[in-house]
C-alpha cells in the first residue's frame, strides 16, 4: 500500500470539506506522491486521467495485459500526446491509420473506437482496443521484445550447514555441507557455477564442481546457448554430465500451455531431520526440516532425467531412504511447436578416468492435436544410439511409444548390440478427477547399452575407488547397469467435496543377470475436517533379496489463532501429531507445536516431543529459524537419554553491482535489485522480513523468467522522510538475469508550515508555492497550511493569492523553519 504523506492527508481532508473549489481547481494526484519536481505549474488539476505535462516511465496495458514499460512525453495538451510506429508495434496493436504516412498516433487514433485511461498514481496507462486490432497473448505471457537482459553483476547464493550428533553407545559424528550457486552477468552473458563442499567426521573434506558454464538466451531462436561443464537433456536419452557446448530450446520462453513439469519431493519427518537429495551422485539439496510433512518444490537441478535419491536422517541417527522417479512426461507438444536440443563435447562422468567424445541431437515436433514425432541420435567413439518415437493425444490420454537401438564396442573388443522400448501414459479424467501423473514402462534387451553404460564398462577393470568419490562404480552397477524392466506410475484421485484426496505411486525394477526385483509402493490419503487437516500414508518396499519393509503413518495438524490484525497482530500456532507403525506394530510418535512470531513475522519456531518404541526412548527437541533481511539462520537441538543432536545453518546471497554490494535473505537463479533511494525499511510483496536497507536497496528473488513479475514496495512501516512516487513496478527478465528496478523517490526534506496573509485571512487552498527561482516546491493545503519539499531551507517562498491579477505574497524564513510557528505571508 502507498504511504500516506502529509500532503496527501491535507488534500484528502480538504476534498471532504470544500466542494466549491473542487469544481474550479483540480489537483493532479501524481503530486500527492511526489509530483513533478522543479517544474512550474500554472493550473493544478485533481484528475488522474489528465497527467501534468512532462516525461514519464509508464507501464502500458492493452486489454488488461501488460505490454511493457515505455517512456512517454505528455504534451501541454494531453490530447496531442502520441506513440511512435515502433512502440505501437511492440504493443501488439495493428492500426490502419499508419497508411496515411503518420509516424505517430494520438491515443484517440490508436484505440480505434476504444478507450484509454491513466492511473498516474501508479504510472499506468490502459488501452482498451477492439480485439480485432490486437495480437492476442496468453495470460501472463510477455513477448520477447520486452524481455530484459538485466545489469552487470556478480552474485553468489550460499548455504552452510553443520550437523552434530553424540551417541553414548557409538561416539559422535559431525557432517558439514556447503553449497555455492554463483554467477557473473556481463554484457548479457551469464557465467554460472554450482559447487559444493562435504565433510564427514575426521575424513578430509572434498570440493566438487557440479556445473560451470557460460550462458546466453536468444529470443530469435527461443533457445539458450551454454558452453562449459553441464548436463545433456534427458528428454530422449539418459542425462550425461559433460564438457562442451549445448544449444537447446528453452520451453519457458513459450507460453505456459506449452511447457513441461518439475519434480516434487515430499515425505514426513519424525524429528528434527536432515533431508538430503542426490542426483547423479551429487548432493543437490540438503536442509534441516522440523517434524511433520515436508514438500520440496524449489529444486535447482542441473541434469534432467536422473532419478532423485532422497534420505531422511532423523535426530536419533536412523535413516530412511527412497527414490523419486524423475522422467519426462510423454513427449507431447502443441501443434506447430518444436523442441530442439544439440550437444557436443566430452563426457565428464564422476569417478570415471576414461571419458569419451560424443555428439547428441534431438528434435520433437507437434504435427497436430493428435500426433507428435520425436527422435534423436548419439554418436561417440565406438558407440552410437538412435531413437524414434511418437506421441499420441487420444481420448484415452496422452501416450508415447519409442524405440532405441544401441551399439557399443568396448576397449577389450566386446561388442554389444541391443534395443530398448518404452511406453508412457498421462491422463486426467475430469469426470472422476483422476490424474495419472506419469505411468511409464521400459524394456531393454540384455545387450542394450546407454552411453553411461558404455563409459562405465570401459572403466570397470581399472577403477580404483577414491575415498572422496561421492559415487562408487559399484553403486552404478548395483542400481543402473543392466536394467531389464522398469515401471513407474503416479496417480491421484480427488474425492467428492469434503472427502479429501488419494494418491498412489509405485516403482518396480528388475535386472539382467540378477534374480529378484526391487519394488516400492506409496499410498496416501489427505483431508480436512473444519480447520483440522490430516494425512494417512502407507508405504511398502521390497529389495532384490526379498527383504520387506512396511510403514504406516497418521499425521494430524490443528491450528489455533488470535489477534484481529488491527489492534493486535494476528498470530497462529499449529499443534501436530505424527504416529508411525512398522512391521512390528507401533514404532514412534511425535507431538509438536510450531508458529511464527516477530514484528515482521521473521521468526519461525517449533518444539516437539517424540517417543521411539524401539529402545523405549523419549526425545525432546526444538528448532528456530530467523528470516533476517540479509540472511536466513536456522538452529535445532534434540536430546534423549542416549544421544544429543544439534544442527545449524545459514543461507543467503551476496550481490555486487554498480550501485554497491548488497546482502540478501536468499537468491534464486533470476532476481531483482530494487532501488528506492532514501526509502529505508520498506518491505517487498508482503514479505515483512525482506526490507530495503538504509540506501533504499533490497534484493528480491523468486523472479519468473520471461513472465510478468509484479514488484511492490510497502512503506507503511518506514520512517524515512523521502517520498515514494509510485510503489509498483513490473519486470520480465531473461533466465538468469539480474534486473535493476528503480523506484522514483523525492528525497527533499518535507516541511509542514502554518501561514496566513497579512490581513489575517487564510491562503487560498490548492495554490502553488514557488521558490525564489519560480520553481514549484509545494502547495497550500487545508487550514492555510503549506506543504513544501526542499533540499535546503529556502530564504523565502512565494504563494499565489490572486492568479487572475498575478498577485502573490512572500514568506521569509531565517536559517531554519519552525513548524510550530505561524508565519505571515506579505
Located regions from the model:
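Extracytoplasmic assembly/pore-lining segments of large envelope/extracellular complexes
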Residues: 296-304
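Outer-membrane beta-barrel transmembrane domain signature of Gram-negative proteins
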Residues: 342-360, 364
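Beta-propeller domains
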Residues: 372-385, 400
